[in-house]
């Protein structure tokens, strides 16, 4: 790894540890504070709507000023989000404020992180570098959710939010130490032009992959409501999932370059594993969580290899914007369908898996890829 990759990896580790102490538990915190399941789904729908609306303004800010400025906006929004979680009250106004700050934090964080990901990963070793950064990310996540669950079960949310904010702030140090030979340059934002050039099968595959985040959100609620109503259960299962993710990324990450069937196999097994997890208890649930980490990472590496490879044909800002809009459109449409037409949590998960399974019908179009 070169110096920038090391600095970026430090940023990824610290920020991942800090935000995952509490982020996965937000829907459960709302549920425990008196919000109904459908109200929590409404909150998640608003998050995705705001995320979609904020996509262009956030990329404009990063293009006009810098992605580091956008990262600061993400940090400030994260801090406000944590403060709001300490003063929860049951009202639509609170849900709107919380969902907006969460969306702004996520856009500020992920747009800047993805931009620097695109810059530090070279075309010659995409899979190996991404696998290593991914391992570092999951090292930050692996214990953070469990530690967060312990703090929520035995202490107070105030202590957890303070720790989370401090770690997130510290993560800015390596981010600001990034130093590239070619400085960030503003460009003309032409997302429609970029969208037209990207093969539509790729657009669908990128969007469908992001539905995994919807599955994770729903499963967090499902496990708490129907399996065991404490934070530690979620923390332990997440620890198991992230452990298997690290093992797979370390052992098989480089093989993604050579294996063309990884995408189809990963989508198939992801759907099977989540169906297994949906119908599991006790030891089977632990096994399903372990397999979830393996096949989710297999799916992620298959998608991200093509995402980064294709990015070398475009300006990063426009490419980042198109991907951002794509993922938010897919999530918003699916969550809206769930909110307006489905009442059963288990059926919600099955519907999302159904849409993800369509990825097996498509394949990545590599006609645009440069051979340099």
What are these regions (language model features)?
Residues 159-177, 347-364:
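Symmetry-related core transmembrane helices of the 12-TM Major Facilitator Superfamily/SLC fold
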Residues 100-135:
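Cytoplasmic helix-loop-helix junction between adjacent transmembrane helices
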Residues 69-84, 165, 261-276:
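Structural signature of the two symmetry-related core transmembrane helices
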Residues 26, 108-121, 296-313:
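Intracellular juxtamembrane helix-capping segments at the cytosolic ends
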Residues 1-50, 196-238:
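Helix-loop boundary and gating motifs at the non-cytosolic
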Residues 49-57, 140-143, 236-256:
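Transmembrane alpha-helices of Major Facilitator/SLC transporters
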Residues 130-146, 326-334:
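Glycine-rich segments within core transmembrane alpha-helices of 12-TM secondary carriers
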Residues 13, 92-109, 284-299:
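Hydrophobic core of transmembrane alpha-helices in multi-pass small-molecule transporters
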């Amino acid at each position: 790894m070169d110096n920038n990759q090391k600095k970026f990896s430090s940023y990824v580790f610290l920020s991942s540890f800090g935000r995952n102490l509490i982020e996965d538990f937000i829907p459960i915190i709302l549920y425990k504070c008196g919000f109904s399941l459908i109200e929590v789904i409404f909150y998640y729908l608003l998050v995705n709507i705001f995320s979609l609306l904020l996509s262009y303004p956030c990329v404009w800010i990063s293009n006009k000023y810098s992605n580091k400025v956008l990262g600061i906006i993400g940090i400030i929004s994260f801090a406000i989000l944590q403060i709001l979680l300490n003063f929860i009250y049951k009202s639509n106004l609170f849900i709107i404020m919380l969902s907006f700050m969460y969306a702004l934090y996520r856009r500020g964080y992920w747009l800047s992180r993805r931009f620097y990901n695109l810059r530090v990963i070279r075309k010659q070793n995409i899979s190996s570098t991404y696998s290593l950064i991914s391992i570092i990310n999951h090292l930050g996540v692996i214990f953070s959710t469990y530690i967060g669950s312990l703090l929520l079960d035995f202490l107070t949310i105030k202590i957890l939010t303070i720790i989370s904010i401090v770690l997130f702030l510290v993560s800015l140090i390596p981010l600001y130490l990034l130093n590239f030979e070619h400085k960030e340059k503003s460009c003309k934002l032409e997302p429609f032009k970029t969208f037209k050039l990207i093969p539509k099968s790729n657009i669908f595959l990128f969007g469908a992959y992001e539905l995994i985040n919807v599955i994770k959100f729903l499963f967090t609620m499902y496990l708490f409501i129907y399996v065991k109503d404490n934070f530690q259960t979620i923390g332990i299962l997440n620890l198991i999932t992230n452990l298997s993710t690290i093992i797979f990324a370390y052992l098989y990450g480089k093989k993604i370059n050579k294996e063309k069937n990884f995408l189809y196999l990963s989508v198939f097994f992801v759907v099977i594993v989540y169906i297994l997890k949906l119908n599991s208890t006790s030891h089977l649930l632990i096994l399903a969580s372990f397999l979830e980490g393996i096949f989710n990472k297999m799916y992620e590496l298959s998608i991200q290899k093509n995402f980064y490879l294709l990015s070398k044909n475009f300006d990063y800002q426009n490419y980042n914007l198109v991907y951002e809009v794509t993922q938010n459109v897919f999530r918003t449409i699916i969550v809206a369908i769930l909110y307006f037409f489905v009442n059963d949590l288990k059926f919600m998960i099955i519907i999302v898996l159904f849409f993800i399974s369509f990825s097996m019908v498509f394949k990545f179009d590599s006609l645009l890829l440069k051979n340099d």
